């Protein structure tokens, strides 16, 4: 089986119900899934770019897991993308070059506080989740990655029941294991 790296960008995992449960479920498959917690690994947001490149070069699939913050990712993921996906390594002008992110399967696993119906043209947000995630999708395309369907959990609020969270964790694990 191919190895998948989950790049976790949650600034407060201790108080997360959904993301925490997802990670607990994925840890059962540590031989197939590498969980890379950016906040734990880099609390000061100063990345070891060579180490990050080595990790990425040794996996087939990458999943960016994060809570939606103001219709984007937490700042640490944006900084990671800026610092790690470098010109000449992840992308460039030479169509014949072997850029390291080319043809990697890349997906998004996102938790959202609001209900799914809010994310539509007629919903309170006025945009679909696909539209909200366009900057990430454009990045994947630009670096030559293969975009995977996004895994989205709506209504990620403290009142969300354990049964719904547990069910989503199993589905998330299956989603990754079947890449």
Give a label for each model feature.
Residues 1-32, 171-173:
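N-terminal beta1-alpha1 ligand-phosphate binding loop
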Residues 50-137:
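Helix-loop-strand module that forms the ligand-binding subsite of alpha/beta enzymes
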Residues 43-59, 168-171:
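Glycine-rich, highly charged phosphate/nucleotide-binding loops
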Residues 32-45:
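A short beta-strand-loop structural module common to alpha/beta enzyme folds
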Residues 17-21, 47, 75-79, 163:
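Generic recognition of short, well-ordered alpha-helical segments
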Residues 23-27, 133-179:
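Glycine-rich phosphate/pyrophosphate-binding loop and the adjoining helix
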Residues 11-13, 40-43, 126, 155-159:
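Short histidine/acidic/glycine/proline-rich micro-motifs that form metal-
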Residues 5-7, 36, 63, 107-109, ...:
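Hydrophobic/aromatic beta-strand patches that form the interior of the parallel beta-sheet core
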């Amino acid at each position: 089986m191919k190895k998948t790296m989950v790049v976790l960008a949650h600034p407060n995992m201790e108080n997360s119900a959904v993301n925490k449960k997802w990670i607990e479920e994925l840890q059962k498959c540590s031989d197939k899934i590498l969980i890379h917690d950016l906040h734990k690994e880099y609390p000061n947001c100063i990345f070891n770019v060579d180490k990050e490149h080595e990790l990425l070069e040794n996996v087939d699939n990458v999943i960016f897991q994060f809570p939606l913050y103001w219709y984007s990712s937490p700042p640490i993921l944006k900084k990671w993308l800026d610092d790690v996906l470098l010109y000449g390594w992840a992308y460039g002008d030479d169509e014949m070059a072997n850029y390291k992110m080319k043809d990697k399967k890349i997906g998004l696993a996102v938790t959202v506080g609001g209900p799914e119906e809010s994310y539509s043209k007629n919903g309170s947000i006025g945009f679909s989740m696909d539209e909200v995630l366009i900057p990430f999708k454009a990045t994947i395309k630009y670096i030559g990655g293969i975009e995977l369907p996004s895994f989205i959990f709506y209504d990620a609020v403290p009142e969300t029941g354990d049964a719904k969270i547990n069910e989503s964790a199993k589905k998330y694990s299956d989603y990754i294991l079947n890449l």
